[in-house]
Amino acid sequence: MKKVLALVVAAAMGLSSAAFAAETATTPAPTATTTKAAPAKTTHHKKQHKAAPAQKAQAAKKHHKNTKAEQKAPEQKAQAAKKHAKKHSHQQPAKPAAQPAA
């Protein structure tokens, strides 16, 4: 049991004494436990990538922006029409006010 513990500690530290302990061990079972112990310590955690749905959502948002831009075009025409209406309305009341004064 102490030999197995010594092998695990030596394998973890990465010393050359692991080879010496493996030579002195009489049973091949402790060497098998060292090979099982080493991969258990090096566990790799995989990250989940979820960037693809976000890109699809951004593309959908861009399409919505284009539809909003198309809706703004008629509003600009209406504003231009309002400006013309205001200019004509200001000129018309001014003329009748000047005529009675003369």
From Swiss-Prot:
Residues 22-41, 91-102 have a biased composition (Low complexity). Residues 1-21 form the signal peptide. Residues 22-102 are annotated as: Disordered. Pfam families: Asr. NCBIfam families: acid_shock_Asr (NF033636). This is Acid shock protein. Its main location: periplasm. The keyword Signal applies. It comes from Escherichia coli O157:H7. The keyword Oxidoreductase does not apply. One of its GO terms (cellular component) is periplasmic space. It is found in: Periplasm. InterPro entries: Acid_shock. The gene is asr. Required for growth and/or survival at acidic conditions. Keywords: Periplasm, Signal. Residues 80-90 have a biased composition (Basic residues). Belongs to the Asr family. Residues 22-58 form a propeptide.
